[in-house]
């Protein structure tokens, strides 16, 4: 039975309008984005099958286009709708960390970085630029791809810091594997960046590694002195 044949008020869109999005399951929310299913599967059933196929919403949103679009009932249009929803969530998170906001709450920073980086299927190295009062200047994604000590260039970081007149920075990157534990390469990158920034009297406050549901802070581990 298609969703249009369900009793009035029972479809996911009706439920969202009547009760709010928080009352919908993951499959129902996804069905609202998908809008329709295919022969033999309504939108909710299709949503459930996609979540099951990829092992969760995060994996679905991180999956490359070719992996998503090869499945019955999902083409470029539906893939674009899902990616647009994911990007909107990132931009809402970015608005929560506005220019000029003072970073006095570590949980706010963690939540922001989680929303920015957890749903990427590739590695991203980014920098949060702060002024002398630790107010936000800008969040910038610097490098994408395989992040190792050879692919992160301290001179580019220093150049950006000078351009934006930052007094302190927090660097971060994600592990698409979902495991946030830093590697030895991560520690080498951090040391090189700390030394490079010290030459221009800019403090490296932290390096945060973002996993699936956790963030590892170098500062909390005592790895940044």
From Swiss-Prot:
InterPro entries: MPN, RadC_JAB, RuvA_2-like, UPF0758, UPF0758_CS, UPF0758_N
Binding residues for Zn(2+): 173, 175, 186
A UniProt-annotated Pfam family: UPF0758_N
Superkingdom of source: Bacteria
Keywords from the named record: Hydrolase, Metal-binding, Metalloprotease, Protease, Zinc
Gene Ontology terms: biological process: proteolysis
Chain positions of motif JAMM motif: 173-186
GO molecular-function terms, A-Z: metal ion binding; metallopeptidase activity
Residue ranges occupied by any MPN domain in the UniProt entry: 102-224
NCBIfam families for the chain: PRK00024.1, radc
Family, as annotated: Belongs to the UPF0758 family.
Name by which UniProt lists this protein: UPF0758 protein Sputw3181_0338
Organism, scientific name: Shewanella sp. (strain W3-18-1)
């Amino acid at each position: 039975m298609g969703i249009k044949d369900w009793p009035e008020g029972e479809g996911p869109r009706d439920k969202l309008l009547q009760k709010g999005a928080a009352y919908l399951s993951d499959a129902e929310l996804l069905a609202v984005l998908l809008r329709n299913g295919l022969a033999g599967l309504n939108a909710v059933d299709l949503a459930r099958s996609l979540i099951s196929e990829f092992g969760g919403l995060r994996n679905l949103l991180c999956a490359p286009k070719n992996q998503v679009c090869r499945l019955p009932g999902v083409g470029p249009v539906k893939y674009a709708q899902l990616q647009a929803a994911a990007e909107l969530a990132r931009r809402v998170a970015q608005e929560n960390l506005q220019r000029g906001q003072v970073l006095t709450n570590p949980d706010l920073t963690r939540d922001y970085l989680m929303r920015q980086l957890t749903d990427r299927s590739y590695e991203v190295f980014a920098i949060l630029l702060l002024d002398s009062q630790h107010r936000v200047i800008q969040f910038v994604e610097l490098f994408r791809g395989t992040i190792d000590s050879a692919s992160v260039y301290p001179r580019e970081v220093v150049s950006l810091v000078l351009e934006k007149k930052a007094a302190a920075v927090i660097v971060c990157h994600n592990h698409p594997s979902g495991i946030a534990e830093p590697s030895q390469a991560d520690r080498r990158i951090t040391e090189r960046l700390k030394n490079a920034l010290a030459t221009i009297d800019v403090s490296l406050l932290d390096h945060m590694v973002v996993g699936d549901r956790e963030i590892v802070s170098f500062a909390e581990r005592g790895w940044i002195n």
